[in-house]
Amino acid sequence: VGEPATYWRLDAPDTFVRPYNENTLFGRWNYPLGVTMYGLLHTAIAIGSEDIKNYIKDHVQLCIDTLEYALWDKEQYGGATSIHNLLTSIDSLDDCGSFASMMLEVNKYLGLRDVKKVADYVGDYIYNHQSRLEDGTFFRKEMMHHFHNMTMWADDLYMSVPFLVRYSQFTGDQKYLDDAANQFFGFKKRLFM
């Protein structure tokens, strides 16, 4: 009943505004920023820098606050979104694990609003949708970049285990911690570790 949901409109018939995050760093969600922001967080804590803490919190909060729109944008217009294209089109741990793990760490130390919806979104992907071998070990089966297909990468441990451990603490659900531990057994069995 009524008009479908929209986000931003101009005062003109059938005219909509689609936000675009042109910034290469602030408000972006990606693997390298997850690693970098994690380091910055613990640096800020160690040196007592409120400026760095505020920057990190604002960055992560912007990602949380715009995810709902980004998912709507993808559904409404199709294809990659102009905001959070990796998070709305997850096909690997690269797209979600590092940043989501850092997000939970930021929440632990600085507090974030609505972090649960994003944590659950990523947790659902990793636990229920990420490709796995028969014993549950993460595996790259069919991905956007074909050279990844049918491969196993040791860095998938980094992109999964810290998130799963923090998510287990966040939710209080032991199954995520068990999954994290089992990843080490599966990777050790197959890789030179």
Model-derived regions, located:
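Low-complexity, Ser/Thr/Pro/Gly-enriched N-terminal "stalk/linker" regions
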Residues: 1-79, 113-121, 125-129, 133-136
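Carbohydrate-binding/catalytic loop surfaces
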Residues: 6-25, 74-104, 137-155, 193
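Solvent-exposed, acidic/flexible segments
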Residues: 29, 49, 92, 96, ...
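Well-ordered alpha-helical scaffold segments within catalytic/enzyme domains
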Residues: 34-50, 98-112, 159-173
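N-terminal glycine-rich cofactor-binding segment that shapes the pocket for flavin-like pterin cofactors
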Residues: 71, 84-124, 129
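Alpha-helix capping at helix-to-loop junctions
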Residues: 105-112, 124-135, 169, 173, ...
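Extended ligand-binding clefts on enzyme/binding-domain cores
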Residues: 133, 154-193
